[in-house]
Regions:
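Cleavable N-terminal signal peptides of Sec/SRP-targeted secreted and luminal proteins
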Residues: 1-16
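Extended terminal accessory/targeting regions
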Residues: 15-192
Length: 192
């Protein structure tokens, strides 16, 4: 588990984020020009923020609409399904949001925050599918992933200002997660 924490903590270092567009792509992919069509803006918003995650997954599997960019490197450098928690679908929607907002000229600090917040919502939704005893650990890790993408996400082509408050929040969420994990392991050991 310390490997996971180290992996999340070492995603990327940073300096000031521009309010203008940023080139945010899963590693090794090329921006899909057709995603920039203004008619696709409401469809993008719907898929990122309004449909259930399961609907997004079904649309992604069909590449519907084909003009949007559904490429993803899953959870980038963090584990995709840590401890068996099904985080990949949420990470895929997060990548979809970053790259299509970027292609549409709407990837701003504010929209990055909304997309990052939606990731936390999606990951916590996925946590409802895991064993009830593991749920607090899953939710705690979802919060760590959320703060990690707020702090480090979208940095392949941009630099983000170091934020002491965000660093403190990240450390707090990490400590909470570690405590939840320790409690889960203690309960698991007691129950045999």
């Amino acid at each position: 588990m310390n490997f996971l924490i180290l992996l999340l903590a070492t995603l990327v270092a940073a300096t000031p984020i521009p309010r203008e567009l940023a080139q945010v792509r899963p590693r090794g992919t090329v921006l899909k020009a057709s995603a920039a069509d203004p008619k696709l803006i409401p469809v993008t918003d719907e898929l990122v923020f309004n449909v259930p995650l399961e609907t997004f997954v079904a649309r992604r599997n069909k590449q519907d609409p084909a003009a949007l960019d559904f490429a993803s490197d899953n959870c980038t450098t963090a584990p995709d399904n840590p401890l068996g928690f099904p985080f990949t679908p949420g990470c895929n929607r997060h990548d979809f949001g970053y790259q299509n907002f970027q292609a549409q000229g709407r990837f701003t600090v504010e929209n990055k925050q909304k997309i990052d917040d939606n990731l936390e919502k999606d990951l916590k939704h996925q946590c409802t599918t895991v064993n009830i005893l593991k749920r607090p650990v899953c939710n705690g890790l979802a919060e760590v992933y959320h703060v990690a993408v707020r702090k480090f996400g979208g940095l392949d082509d941009i630099q983000v200002k170091r934020d002491d408050a965000l660093e403190a929040e990240y450390q707090e969420k990490l400590a909470t997660y570690k405590a939840l994990e320790a409690e889960y392991l203690r309960l698991k050991a007691r129950s045999g």
